């Protein structure tokens, strides 16, 4: 009898865990027949695989995962292309994208924060392209090192001012503000609290609002 009771209790526990609050991500990826689509958790400690599906036909997909206790970051990945988004409640997100421009031409419904994250992603991509173009101009000897350094500083300062005003200080308690702090340019943090006192203020604003320790 005790053995049966224990087995029943274990089964109930497993059922309770599997049937708890969940979030759902669904949509379709066009032009991706036969491709693998991955759902991954994205954190400071790294990337963790959660689920995957082989896309067929029109590329419809649906993932369900336990709802996080606090805002967390996730991403969809196909090959080396990614779409970043956040989840902070029992949400249903719908993401549609073409395979070719997966990381930039997607649409997302059901999460205002995730749309802000898309805006930040597109801004970072544009910044990286401008820096790459500037570096190519230097390598072709079309500008001096002094002009390169000044132009690079202007690009970076303009970007940071835009993001600080419109994303970090405007709503420091959001996942988008947190996401902005950890964007990179050539694999270096754009906001660097270890080497820039003004950047420390950005981290402090978000940490205070979200009650976190970021630095």
Predicted regions: what is each one?
Residues 1-17:
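Sec-dependent bacterial lipoprotein signal peptides
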Residues 172-188:
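Amphipathic alpha-helical repeat scaffolds of TPR domains
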């Amino acid at each position: 009898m005790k053995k049966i009771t224990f087995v029943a209790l274990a089964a109930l526990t497993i059922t309770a865990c599997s049937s708890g609050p969940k979030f759902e991500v669904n949509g379709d990826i066009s032009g991706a027949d036969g491709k693998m689509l991955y759902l991954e958790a994205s954190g400071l400690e790294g990337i963790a695989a959660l689920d995957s599906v082989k896309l067929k036909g029109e590329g419809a997909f649906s993932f369900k995962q336990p709802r996080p206790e606090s805002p967390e970051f996730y991403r969809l990945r196909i090959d080396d292309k990614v779409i970043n988004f956040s989840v902070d409640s029992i949400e249903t997100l719908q993401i549609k994208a073409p395979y070719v421009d997966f990381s930039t031409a997607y649409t997302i419904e059901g999460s205002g924060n995730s749309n802000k994250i898309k805006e930040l992603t597109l801004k970072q991509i544009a910044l990286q392209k401008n820096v790459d173009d500037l570096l190519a101009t230097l390598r072709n000897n079309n500008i001096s090192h002094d002009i390169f350094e000044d132009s690079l500083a202007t690009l970076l300062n303009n970007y940071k001012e835009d993001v600080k005003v419109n994303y970090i200080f405007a709503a420091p308690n959001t996942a988008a503000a947190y996401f902005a702090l950890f964007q990179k340019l050539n694999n270096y943090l754009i906001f660097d609290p270890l080497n820039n006192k003004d950047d420390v203020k950005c981290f402090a604003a978000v940490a205070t609002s979200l009650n976190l320790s970021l630095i």
